[in-house]
Amino acid sequence: LSSSNPNLQNIPIRNEDGKEIRKAFIPEDGCEFFSADYSQIELRIMAHLSGDKNMIEAFREGDDIHAATAAKVYKIAIEDVTREQRSKAKTANFGIIYGISVFGLAERMNVPRQEAKELIDGYFDTYPQIKEYMDKSIERARANGYIETIFGRKRFLPDINSRNAVVRGYAERNAIN
């Protein structure tokens, strides 16, 4: 699902303009509107697809997934996670499942590459089945020339075996998305 110009799926609620915009939507008589919160849906789907026990456990326990990731990566108690550590973990959580590189993560977080590398390594140490799932997805794409969705749709990736690292990297990121 998507919408644009305007994006009616993401109308602001925390400011006055957003509150006024929302008043314009009125259900027909006998009907009601409902709201669905897809909180961290990408991470929840990745936890399911990969079967990663640590991430599944964090969701089942109702933990703040970004704080839980920070706690595990930085090897501290969840209650000791700082705002900055949580923010970095959040960037890593979403960036990594979309195939961000050490360089890309360092740029996005404005940190040295070594710190970004340590964060990615810590992430995969924490969630090893996610790494395994991503690697196997790329492996299957290389062997077949496509990746298949859970509904059987094939996404062809003609550049997955390219000799050009940049072109191949783009196809590999598409294989895990």
Regions found by a protein language model. Name each.
Residues 1-80, 142-177:
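Acidic, glycine-rich two-metal-ion catalytic cores of nucleic acid-processing enzymes
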Residues 71-177:
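Conserved catalytic core of nucleic-acid polymerases
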